[in-house]
Curated annotation (Swiss-Prot):
Similarity comment text for this entry: Belongs to the sodium:solute symporter (SSF) (TC 2.A.21) family.
Pfam family, any one: SSF
Activation/inhibition comment: Inhibited by phlorizin.
GO terms, molecular function: D-glucose:sodium symporter activity; low-affinity D-glucose:sodium symporter activity
Gene: SLC5A4
Any one of the GO CC terms: plasma membrane
Cytoplasmic side: 1-28, 86-105, 192-208, 292-314, 444-455, 548-638
The protein's name: Solute carrier family 5 member 4
Parts of the chain that traverse the membrane: 29-47, 65-85, 106-126, 172-191, 209-229, 271-291, 315-334, 424-443, 456-476, 527-547, 639-659
Entry-listed glycosylation sites: N248
């Protein structure tokens, strides 16, 4: 079911599939150009108005972001072009159940805002590996998690976003793949490098608005074309391709006939493509890793003005996460109705003719809808939507990955690095990420086997659960120590890696040909595997922790839930190392009297290095630290966000029940 890679079944795309009318008219091109100009203008505005000259300013937007741009940024960071391609594609292939992945986030967003973020803020951290270092001490956990997170960024996030964006670019413009991707990444990087997190959050807000407007318009066109909701449900069940024989293959009807449970979210626990116990429990584990411990998501919450703003942002994002079912999954299913021969193709030679890959063209469901259904001008708007979702996800990944590298890895290599050096290192690392991303593209092209969204979720299921287990125990079980956490992560990672490599090597099979992967490794659905992996990791962490010395409470004040309200002074486990670093600090390598030329001034303006605030006294530093670790809320706003959280949970229960 989890569709990953099977190189043996992939045929390289000879060129973009033929579309009746590519984006070559003035209206479409004008819309795209205006879009890029506005995005760059917003990025430059954020660059000039915010303080990017400090690490906190560049990476956390100075903890001054209000709830609505933060909520929009959470949504935009999550919804990449991979969602438009992947959700619509899986919807076209198997119905609405894939939307449960989106709705599952409603609960986890509340867990993030009410339980995880308060601890992260009280801990005074910028990155998730940094939290583990404060909580457990030592360096190996921090370094290991930083490297693993960067690997996940490249192998999973950047790769799937670039692949899905490339589908649109090839269909719409007929451009050379590498030229188009290079241009996109270059523009994306410019405002990430120059603007920092504030720039990313404000451009995300703009792009969320563009995404929602464009998606609603396309949804309207799609439902009008198919004749309304009742007609849609009837026609989808009859969307069967006419060519079902060929290539000397005997193709089972189940490979090309819509599933009987296409309009149900809860599916059979054994035979279902998304079994209901896996959807409720396994999916929650993967979602807990993504929403509560992932750097890209948590970093947005750490930038919030106060806890009420953070909680309101989580609620706003939760409501927005209700929309993908109607904006992406159902339009993907309508695409199967309108373009059955292409989207639902089953004979390998026919699929190669339509989209260049033997195992199906469901990934092309949404792009086809855009290119064939939308009139001029609106087609350009929809391509802008795709570019918006691609670029917003990439900027979020670039900014968060550079934070991880700078704060968790670079500071280990260069212990006495000045703040200016850290800022430059973070920006240079973004450039390195872009190079790696472009080199990764050929590997991404192989990932066309089957359905992109199942590829994304299956890889997440193999890498995420051990991280979720460690963070959950770190916050809610103070008895857990460094040895338990480290070996729980390592053993969980090895188990997940074995399954992932096996699927890369053997493939996951398709309806036409079963995978040769050994049953003992690949026989369990990836959502069940995530659940097994989670509990194995928890058992290892607890067992080793109970067999070794506990961490004294004096090191844990405000780092775990039981001690979250402690007022005693915490002695950090890494305090000795911090003192050593501070002993080498305090010398600013910049000479304030130095005369600078025009080029140097322009460079400093571009990188946000010119705006140095006054040197803070010890008292001012303490006051700033208190602000950055403050989780207090005004009673009125606390009550308002709590009531809204209950309403959001009620809505989540209703939609699950209605589509069950």
């Amino acid at each position: 079911m989890a569709s990953t890679l099977s190189p043996s079944t992939v045929t390289k795309t000879p060129g973009p599939p033929e579309i009746s009318e590519r984006i070559q008219n003035a209206a479409d091109i004008s819309v795209i150009v205006i879009y890029f100009v506005v995005v760059m203008a917003v990025g430059l505005w954020a660059m000039l108005r915010t303080n990017r000259g400090t690490v906190g300013g560049f990476f956390l937007a100075g903890r001054d972001v209000t709830w609505w741009p933060m909520g929009a940024s959470l949504f935009a960071s999550n919804i990449g072009s991979g969602h438009f391609v992947g959700l619509a594609g899986t919807g076209a292939a198997s119905g609405i159940a894939i939307a449960a992945f989106e709705w599952n986030a409603l609960l986890l967003l509340l867990v993030l805002g009410w339980f995880f973020v308060p601890i992260y803020i009280k801990a005074g951290v910028m990155t998730m590996p940094e939290y583990l270092r404060k909580r457990f001490g030592g360096k190996r956990l921090q370094i290991y998690l930083s490297i693993l997170s960067l690997f996940i960024c490249v192998a999973l996030r950047i790769s799937s976003d670039i692949f899905s964006g490339a589908i649109f670019i090839k269909l719409a413009l007929g451009l050379d793949l590498y030229l188009a991707i290079f241009s996109l990444l270059a523009i994306t990087a410019i405002y990430t490098i120059t603007g920092g997190l504030a720039s990313v959050i404000y451009t995300d807000t703009l792009q969320t608005i563009i995404m929602l407007i464009g998606s609603f318009i396309l949804m309207g066109f799609a439902f009008v074309e198919v004749g309304g909701y009742e007609s849609f449900t009837e026609k989808y069940m009859n969307a069967i391709p006419t060519i079902v024989e060929g290539d000397n293959l005997t193709i089972s009807p189940k490979c090309y006939t819509p599933q009987g449970d296409s309009f149900h979210i809860f599916r059979d626990a054994v035979t279902g493509d998304i079994p209901w116990p896996g959807m409720i429990f396994g999916m929650t584990v993967v979602a807990a890793w993504y929403w509560c411990t992932d750097q890209v998501i948590v970093q947005r919450c750490l930038s919030g003005k106060d806890m009420s703003h953070v909680k309101a942002a989580c609620i706003m994002c939760g409501y927005l996460k209700l929309l993908p079912m109607f904006l992406m999954v159902m339009p993907g299913m309508i695409s199967r109705i309108l373009y059955t021969e292409k989207v639902a193709c089953v004979v390998p030679s026919e699929c190669v003719k339509h989209c260049g890959t033997e195992v199906g063209c469901s990934n092309y469901a949404y792009p086809l809808l855009v290119m064939e259904l939308m009139p001029s001008g609106l087609r350009g708007l929809m391509l802008s939507v795709m570019l918006a979702s691609l670029m917003s996800s990439l900027t979020s990944i670039f900014n968060s990955a550079s934070t991880l590298f700078t704060m968790d890895l670079y500071t280990k290599i260069r212990k006495q690095a000045s703040e200016k050096e850290l800022l430059i290192a973070g920006r240079l690392f973004i450039i390195l990420l872009i190079v790696i991303s472009i080199v990764w593209v050929p590997l991404v092209q192989v990932a066309q086997n089957g359905q992109l969204f199942h590829y994304i979720e299956s890889i997440s299921s193999y890498l995420g659960p051990p991280i979720a287990a460690v963070f959950l125990l770190a916050i809610f079980c103070k008895r857990v120590n460094e040895q338990g956490a480290f070996w729980g992560l390592i053993i969980g990672f090895v188990m997940g890696l074995i399954r992932m490599i096996a699927e890369f090597v053997y493939g996951t099979g398709s309806c036409l040909a079963a995978s040769n992967c050994p049953q003992i490794i690949c026989g369990v659905h990836y959502l069940y595997f995530a659940l097994i992996l989670f509990f194995v990791s928890i058992l290892v962490v607890l067992a080793i922790s109970l067999l070794t010395k506990p961490i004294p409470d004096v090191h844990l004040y405000r780092l775990c839930w039981a001690l979250r309200n402690s007022t005693e002074e915490r002695i950090d486990l890494d305090a000795e190392e911090k003192r050593h670093e501070e002993a080498h600090d305090g010398v600013d390598e910049d000479n304030p009297e130095e005369t600078r030329g025009c080029l140097r001034k322009a460079y400093d303006l571009f990188c946000g290095l010119q705006r140095k605030g006054p040197k803070l006294s010890k008292e001012e530093e303490e006051a700033q630290k208190r602000k950055l670790t403050d989780t207090s809320e005004k009673p009125l706003w606390k009550t308002i966000v709590n009531i809204n959280a209950i309403l959001l949970l009620a809505v989540a229960v209703f939609v699950h029940g209605y589509f069950a």
